[in-house]
């Protein structure tokens, strides 16, 4: 899968090699379900640093780990970005040793907790460039009472 920005920053071009097709996802559709999963198109798309603001709330032990995390609140920079993503904010637990998000709470446009993310089995996938990725992800949609599990993440 390859995701790129379209001519409008709010549009995304999605290429799925299995189907050999490019699909354009317009800005307002990016908060909709990604192929029936609990992920939205905006969840799997590349984000830009200027699309949101972040502030460190505190430092604490990462959920389910012994390592230290920063707890960071991320909010969309504009109402347009807020509507596009479908989130009013997220709170993310980011490991201090490798900057990988290992947990996250995502809030809907009314401020209600909507999704919970847990990422485990974090491994260094590219030692030369010091890139780390989780190899097991659980995303839970609390409003639909549905979870997505992935343990086949490849780099």
Please state what every model-predicted region is.
Residues 20:
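Phosphate/NTP-binding elements of NTP-utilizing enzymes
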Residues 16, 26, 58:
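Residues at the C-termini of beta-strands that transition into short coil/loop
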Residues 1-17:
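N-terminal mature ectodomain segment of secretory-pathway/periplasmic proteins
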Residues 55-63, 120-125:
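Short amphipathic beta-strand and strand-loop transition segments with alternating hydrophobic
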Residues 6, 64-66:
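Solvent-exposed loop and beta-edge segments used for protein-protein assembly and interaction
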Residues 2, 11, 23-25, 32-47, ...:
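Gly/Pro-enriched, hydrophobic low-complexity segments
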